[in-house]
Amino acid sequence: MLAEEALLHGSFLLHYQPKIALDTGRRIGFEALLRLKKPDGSVIGPTAFSAAFDEPILSRRIGSHVLRCAVAQAKAWATAGVDFGHIAINVSSSQFIGLPGSPCLVDEILGATRSAGLSPRHIQVEVTEGVMLSEQGGDIGTQLEALRTAGFIVAFDDFGTGFASLVHLKEFSYDQIKIDGSFVRAMTGSSADHAIVKAIIDMAKALGKQVVAEGVETVAELHALRELGCNYGQGFLFGRPTSASDLRVLPD
């Protein structure tokens, strides 16, 4: 299997996409995105190995690999004196499952960051609604609350695309809401999508949550999000996902 071979041969790697404070334009962190390097040197995205995430044990192994790589990169930047903000990682439903002989997700994240001498502020956790709907996950709400209590920021990813986003927003514990890029990309040409983005931002403010807009690609979208009071953004307008070696991480 492609994913198993990638884990065995160390072919999985992380690319990093910057996250920006929309009011100042300052970079506040990165999202780590999984990629696979093929023998010919080309790099492919997760759609090529998405089937691996349907297998709980394999998916958990991949998630643990992503955590280790993100923590190692955060430590490298911190050691070099780079003010990188944070690295956000996506967590799958399989990672919430307790397996014999393996630490629970909370202990795994805490252990990895502490061993690297990092603060919880250096690593963020992003969870999609698909994880909430999955029957594979364990006591997700309790684990998310434990992460927040320990000082980690938890984000509700791809908000607005699921079947029960509002229900899960009420039932689970989050610090940030990430607006799905499909709404952001359509908002300047569609009054309906603009209204949806505005409603999400207003709701988040009322709940005391921060908002991240995904998929920001144009200056018009940036201006519209600023006018609505969106806190943060990420997308091709600010930078494409790229390897750590190709990133410009020194102060502007």
Regions from the PLM with identified roles:
Residues 74-78, 114, 141-149, 198-205, ...:
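Surface-exposed amphipathic alpha-helices with a cationic face
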